[in-house]
Protein backbone atom coordinates (compact mmCIF):
# COMPACT_ATOMS: atom_id res chain seq x y z
CA UNK A 1 0.00 0.00 0.00
CA UNK A 2 1.27 3.47 -0.90
CA UNK A 3 1.85 5.93 1.95
CA UNK A 4 -0.73 8.26 0.38
CA UNK A 5 -3.32 5.56 1.09
CA UNK A 6 -2.43 5.39 4.79
CA UNK A 7 -4.54 7.17 7.42
CA UNK A 8 -3.33 10.78 7.62
CA UNK A 9 -2.12 10.47 11.22
CA UNK A 10 0.19 7.57 10.24
CA UNK A 11 1.89 9.28 7.29
CA UNK A 12 5.39 10.45 8.27
CA UNK A 13 5.09 14.00 6.91
CA UNK A 14 1.67 14.62 8.42
CA UNK A 15 2.78 13.03 11.68
CA UNK A 16 5.80 15.34 11.86
CA UNK A 17 3.64 18.40 11.23
CA UNK A 18 1.09 17.51 13.90
CA UNK A 19 3.27 15.82 16.54
CA UNK A 20 6.77 17.12 15.87
CA UNK A 21 9.90 15.27 14.69
CA UNK A 22 10.51 13.63 18.09
CA UNK A 23 7.38 11.51 17.57
CA UNK A 24 8.81 9.83 14.46
CA UNK A 25 10.89 6.66 14.37
CA UNK A 26 14.24 6.53 12.58
CA UNK A 27 12.55 4.76 9.67
CA UNK A 28 9.84 7.43 9.41
CA UNK A 29 12.37 10.28 9.45
CA UNK A 30 14.47 8.49 6.86
CA UNK A 31 11.37 7.95 4.71
CA UNK A 32 10.80 11.71 4.62
CA UNK A 33 14.41 12.15 3.49
CA UNK A 34 14.00 9.47 0.78
CA UNK A 35 10.69 11.03 -0.36
CA UNK A 36 9.71 7.99 -2.47
CA UNK A 37 10.04 4.25 -2.28
CA UNK A 38 10.86 1.76 -5.01
CA UNK A 39 8.77 -0.82 -6.83
CA UNK A 40 7.03 -2.97 -4.25
CA UNK A 41 8.24 -0.94 -1.26
CA UNK A 42 6.90 2.26 0.26
CA UNK A 43 9.39 4.88 1.44
CA UNK A 44 8.95 3.64 5.03
CA UNK A 45 9.53 -0.01 4.02
CA UNK A 46 12.60 1.03 2.04
CA UNK A 47 13.86 3.01 5.03
CA UNK A 48 13.45 -0.03 7.30
CA UNK A 49 15.35 -2.20 4.81
CA UNK A 50 18.19 0.33 4.65
CA UNK A 51 18.45 0.55 8.44
CA UNK A 52 18.65 -3.25 8.57
CA UNK A 53 21.26 -3.31 5.80
CA UNK A 54 23.52 -0.76 7.49
CA UNK A 55 22.76 -1.91 11.03
CA UNK A 56 21.54 1.44 12.34
CA UNK A 57 20.96 5.06 11.42
CA UNK A 58 24.54 5.76 12.43
CA UNK A 59 25.77 3.02 10.11
CA UNK A 60 23.84 4.51 7.21
CA UNK A 61 25.02 8.06 7.82
CA UNK A 62 28.67 7.06 8.24
CA UNK A 63 28.72 4.68 5.25
CA UNK A 64 31.28 5.31 2.54
CA UNK A 65 30.08 6.83 -0.72
CA UNK A 66 30.59 3.51 -2.49
CA UNK A 67 28.62 1.44 0.03
CA UNK A 68 25.87 4.07 0.24
CA UNK A 69 25.41 4.32 -3.51
CA UNK A 70 25.36 0.54 -3.99
CA UNK A 71 22.37 0.16 -1.65
CA UNK A 72 19.05 -0.41 -3.40
CA UNK A 73 16.99 2.77 -3.48
CA UNK A 74 19.92 5.11 -2.93
CA UNK A 75 22.52 6.60 -5.25
CA UNK A 76 24.84 9.54 -5.77
CA UNK A 77 22.10 12.17 -5.60
CA UNK A 78 20.90 10.88 -2.22
CA UNK A 79 24.49 10.69 -0.95
CA UNK A 80 25.06 14.34 -1.87
CA UNK A 81 21.73 15.32 -0.31
CA UNK A 82 22.60 13.50 2.93
CA UNK A 83 26.07 15.05 3.17
CA UNK A 84 24.57 18.50 2.63
CA UNK A 85 22.00 17.86 5.39
CA UNK A 86 24.74 16.77 7.82
CA UNK A 87 26.86 19.82 7.01
CA UNK A 88 23.88 22.15 7.48
CA UNK A 89 23.25 20.59 10.90
CA UNK A 90 26.88 21.06 11.92
CA UNK A 91 26.90 24.68 10.76
CA UNK A 92 23.66 25.35 12.63
CA UNK A 93 25.18 24.15 15.91
CA UNK A 94 28.37 26.11 15.23
CA UNK A 95 26.33 29.28 14.68
CA UNK A 96 24.36 28.65 17.86
CA UNK A 97 27.58 28.27 19.83
CA UNK A 98 28.97 31.50 18.41
CA UNK A 99 25.95 33.32 19.84
CA UNK A 100 26.19 31.80 23.30
CA UNK A 101 28.66 31.63 26.16
CA UNK A 102 29.95 28.13 25.61
CA UNK A 103 30.95 27.41 29.20
CA UNK A 104 27.43 28.25 30.36
CA UNK A 105 25.82 26.19 27.59
CA UNK A 106 27.02 22.67 28.36
CA UNK A 107 24.09 20.96 26.66
CA UNK A 108 24.47 23.04 23.50
CA UNK A 109 28.19 22.23 23.45
CA UNK A 110 27.42 18.53 23.76
CA UNK A 111 24.92 18.66 20.89
CA UNK A 112 27.45 20.44 18.68
CA UNK A 113 30.30 18.02 19.41
CA UNK A 114 28.07 14.97 18.97
CA UNK A 115 27.06 16.29 15.54
CA UNK A 116 30.71 16.88 14.65
CA UNK A 117 32.21 13.60 15.85
CA UNK A 118 29.67 10.82 16.38
CA UNK A 119 29.93 9.45 12.83
CA UNK A 120 33.71 9.60 12.48
CA UNK A 121 34.86 6.01 11.70
CA UNK A 122 38.21 6.58 13.44
CA UNK A 123 39.20 8.44 16.59
CA UNK A 124 39.47 12.22 16.19
CA UNK A 125 40.79 14.65 18.81
CA UNK A 126 39.71 18.28 18.61
CA UNK A 127 39.17 21.39 20.65
CA UNK A 128 36.86 24.36 20.93
CA UNK A 129 38.95 27.53 21.13
CA UNK A 130 37.36 30.27 23.24
CA UNK A 131 38.03 33.94 23.93
CA UNK A 132 38.22 35.54 27.37
CA UNK A 133 34.40 35.67 27.53
CA UNK A 134 34.24 31.96 26.66
CA UNK A 135 32.74 32.73 23.26
CA UNK A 136 33.65 30.34 20.45
CA UNK A 137 36.53 31.40 18.22
CA UNK A 138 36.89 28.18 16.27
CA UNK A 139 36.39 24.44 16.46
CA UNK A 140 39.38 22.51 15.16
CA UNK A 141 39.91 18.81 14.54
CA UNK A 142 43.56 18.41 15.50
CA UNK A 143 44.54 14.74 15.43
CA UNK A 144 43.24 11.79 13.45
CA UNK A 145 43.86 8.20 14.48
CA UNK A 146 42.73 4.63 14.10
CA UNK A 147 39.51 2.98 15.17
CA UNK A 148 40.66 2.84 18.80
CA UNK A 149 43.28 5.54 19.35
CA UNK A 150 44.79 8.82 18.19
CA UNK A 151 48.20 10.22 19.07
CA UNK A 152 47.82 13.58 20.82
CA UNK A 153 50.63 16.10 21.28
CA UNK A 154 50.00 18.79 23.93
CA UNK A 155 52.59 21.17 22.45
CA UNK A 156 50.70 21.21 19.12
CA UNK A 157 47.46 22.06 20.93
CA UNK A 158 49.18 24.87 22.85
CA UNK A 159 50.66 26.25 19.63
CA UNK A 160 47.24 26.26 17.96
CA UNK A 161 45.62 27.93 20.97
CA UNK A 162 48.23 30.69 20.82
CA UNK A 163 47.78 31.16 17.07
CA UNK A 164 44.02 31.53 17.55
CA UNK A 165 44.52 33.86 20.53
CA UNK A 166 42.42 31.58 22.74
CA UNK A 167 42.06 32.28 26.45
CA UNK A 168 40.43 28.91 27.14
CA UNK A 169 39.73 25.62 25.41
CA UNK A 170 37.34 22.69 25.63
CA UNK A 171 38.92 19.41 24.58
CA UNK A 172 37.02 16.65 22.84
CA UNK A 173 37.49 13.30 21.17
CA UNK A 174 35.26 10.49 20.00
CA UNK A 175 35.12 6.79 20.77
CA UNK A 176 34.18 5.04 17.50
CA UNK A 177 32.96 2.08 19.56
CA UNK A 178 30.04 4.30 20.58
CA UNK A 179 30.85 4.00 24.29
CA UNK A 180 31.65 7.44 25.69
CA UNK A 181 33.14 6.32 29.00
CA UNK A 182 36.54 8.06 29.60
CA UNK A 183 39.54 5.74 29.84
CA UNK A 184 42.61 6.05 32.07
CA UNK A 185 44.54 7.07 28.96
CA UNK A 186 41.99 9.85 28.37
CA UNK A 187 42.49 11.11 31.92
CA UNK A 188 46.27 10.95 31.57
CA UNK A 189 46.46 12.95 28.33
CA UNK A 190 43.97 15.48 29.72
CA UNK A 191 46.22 16.09 32.73
CA UNK A 192 49.22 16.57 30.43
CA UNK A 193 47.33 19.07 28.27
CA UNK A 194 46.09 21.01 31.32
CA UNK A 195 49.68 21.22 32.58
CA UNK A 196 50.98 22.45 29.21
CA UNK A 197 48.19 25.00 28.75
CA UNK A 198 48.55 26.36 32.30
CA UNK A 199 52.13 27.44 31.59
CA UNK A 200 50.67 30.06 29.25
CA UNK A 201 47.56 30.83 31.34
CA UNK A 202 45.21 29.06 28.92
CA UNK A 203 42.39 27.37 30.82
CA UNK A 204 41.10 23.91 29.96
CA UNK A 205 37.41 24.16 30.87
CA UNK A 206 36.34 20.64 30.02
CA UNK A 207 37.04 17.50 28.02
CA UNK A 208 34.06 15.86 26.34
CA UNK A 209 34.16 12.25 25.15
CA UNK A 210 31.67 11.63 22.33
CA UNK A 211 30.01 8.26 21.78
CA UNK A 212 26.91 7.17 19.92
CA UNK A 213 24.55 10.09 20.53
CA UNK A 214 26.00 10.93 23.95
CA UNK A 215 28.88 12.99 25.34
CA UNK A 216 30.50 12.55 28.75
CA UNK A 217 31.93 15.66 30.44
CA UNK A 218 35.12 15.47 32.51
CA UNK A 219 34.01 18.59 34.39
CA UNK A 220 30.66 17.04 35.31
CA UNK A 221 32.49 13.92 36.49
CA UNK A 222 34.84 16.00 38.64
CA UNK A 223 37.85 14.92 36.57
CA UNK A 224 38.90 18.53 35.86
Curated annotation (Swiss-Prot):
It comes from the Bacteria. Keywords: Hydrolase, Metal-binding, Metalloprotease, Protease, Zinc. It comes from Pseudoalteromonas atlantica (strain T6c / ATCC BAA-1087). Coiled coil: none annotated. The keyword Transmembrane helix does not apply. Belongs to the UPF0758 family. The keyword Plastid does not apply. One of its GO terms (biological process) is proteolysis. A motif (JAMM motif) lies at residues 173-186. This is UPF0758 protein Patl_0046. Zn(2+) binds at residues 173, 175, 186. Gene3D superfamilies: 5' to 3' exonuclease, C-terminal subdomain, Cytidine Deaminase, domain 2. One of its GO terms (molecular function) is metallopeptidase activity. Residues 102-224 form the MPN domain. Pfam families: RadC, UPF0758_N.
Amino acid sequence: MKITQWPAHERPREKLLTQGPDALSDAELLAIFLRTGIKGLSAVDLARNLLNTFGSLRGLISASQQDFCLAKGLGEAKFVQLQASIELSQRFFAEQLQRETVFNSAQQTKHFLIAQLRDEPNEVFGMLLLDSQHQLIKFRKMFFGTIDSASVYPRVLVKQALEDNAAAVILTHNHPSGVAEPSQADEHITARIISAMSLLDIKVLDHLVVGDGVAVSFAERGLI
